[in-house]
Each structure stands twice: as C-alpha cells, then as structure tokens.
C-alpha cells in the first residue's frame, strides 16, 4: 500500500509540474519612464520550459510636458503631440526561480509611431513575477529602452507593474 501511494504521489507531482509548461497568459501593465512619460501595455505571453517565455506586446505612451503646471486641462494632454504607439516581441529567459516567484531577463525589440516620427526600440530589463492560485500572476519590471532613430529621448529608464491572466486553450 505504501509503495502504491508513493508511486501515485510521484506521478501526480510530475503531471502538475508538466502542466506549468507551455501555458499562455494575457496581461496588462502600467508604468512610467524617467522623462515624464506614462505607458500602458497589453501583451500575450507564451511560457515554454522552466518559465522561459516569449512575449508579444502592444504599448501606448504619453509624454508629459516638462512643466505639468502648463496643463490647464487633461484634454490638452491627449491633444498634444506626445503620444506614441508601438508593437513588439521580447524573449524572457528565466534566471531566478523560487517558490511561487521567478525572475526573468527581458530582451526585446519594437516598432512604432509618434505623430510625426517612426520609432524602433531595443528593450532590456528585468521582470519579477509572483504566482497566485489558478495561474494568475502579479509582476513588476524595470528596464531601459533605446529608441531609434535619433531622438531627444534616446535612452528611457522606467518601471512598471501589472497582472497576468491565464488563457486556457483546449
């Protein structure tokens, strides 16, 4: 009886560990950059083995004027030329694993547009995720973006937080 119970526990634990691989998540995140900029990100993440993942994202940014007291209304912010949009992909190799949390490097590229410009970006940073029940995750990330072609905001340093929701594809 003890042997059968031990075999059942081992088989069940390997099935549960395998269930974490190749999972998909949809996520949303908010954050800001050092130059007064706010951003919102919507992404799809495909997790491969050992928490390594591919992320495909769409991001919108709003650049604030240097002096926020110049804004008399929020609508002026949306009418200004400080809006940027982009889509891209990132590879996230897992470098740190612990119980219910893991950390990944985030290396990616993006293409986008501003009102009068074309944008290309190279992204590098760190993303730390905390796992909750039923596949939900909370994450924070910090990183640097190198935006091309030559722009006044070539290097952007920022951070953000967000949530990842599991997607069940059967």
Positions of PLM-derived features:
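Hydrophobic h-region of N-terminal signal peptides that target proteins for export
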Residues: 9-18
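Sec-dependent signal peptide recognition
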Residues: 2-8
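Low-complexity, intrinsically disordered Gly/Pro/Thr-rich segments
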Residues: 140-148
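Short glycine/proline- and aromatic-enriched beta-strand/turn motifs that initiate or cap beta-hairpins
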Residues: 19-64, 164-170
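Outer-membrane beta-barrel "beta-signal"
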Residues: 87, 153-170
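Solvent-exposed loop/turn segments connecting transmembrane beta-strands
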Residues: 28-41, 50, 81-83, 111-122, ...
